[in-house]
């Protein structure tokens, strides 16, 4: 996808962030800080097919990231 291409270029994916209602989000992708970008980035895939960047510092987004991390760490 477009995100993978940007990561290969070794720069941040998100140039700006957008505030959006959580109900419009289909999928969240958290990109950890690394050599390509010094900050954590959150890319949301919306139900209408668009991809936008969310502010990882926003309280609602922090909660969502926490949920993702917790669910990812659980053994099934």
UniProtKB/Swiss-Prot annotation:
Keywords: Chemotaxis, Cytokine, Disulfide bond, Inflammatory response, Secreted. GO terms for molecular function: chemokine activity. Disulfide bonds join 12-37, 14-53. One of its GO terms (biological process) is positive regulation of release of sequestered calcium ion into cytosol. GO terms for cellular component: extracellular space. It comes from the Eukaryota. InterPro entries: Chemokine_b/g/d, Chemokine_CXC, Chemokine_CXC_CS, Chemokine_IL8-like_dom, CXC_Chemokine_domain, Interleukin_8-like_sf. The keyword Disulfide bond applies. It is found in: Secreted. Alveolar macrophages. The keyword Disulfide bond applies. Has chemotactic activity for neutrophils. Belongs to the intercrine alpha (chemokine CxC) family. This is Alveolar macrophage chemotactic factor. It comes from Oryctolagus cuniculus.
């Amino acid at each position: 996808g477009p995100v993978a291409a940007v990561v290969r270029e070794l720069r941040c994916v998100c140039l700006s962030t957008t505030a959006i209602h959580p109900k419009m989000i289909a999928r969240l992708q958290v990109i950890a800080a690394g050599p390509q970008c010094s900050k954590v980035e959150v890319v949301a895939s919306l139900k209408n097919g668009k991809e936008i960047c969310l502010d990882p510092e926003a309280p609602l987004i922090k909660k969502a990231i926490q949920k993702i991390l917790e669910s990812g760490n659980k053994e099934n």
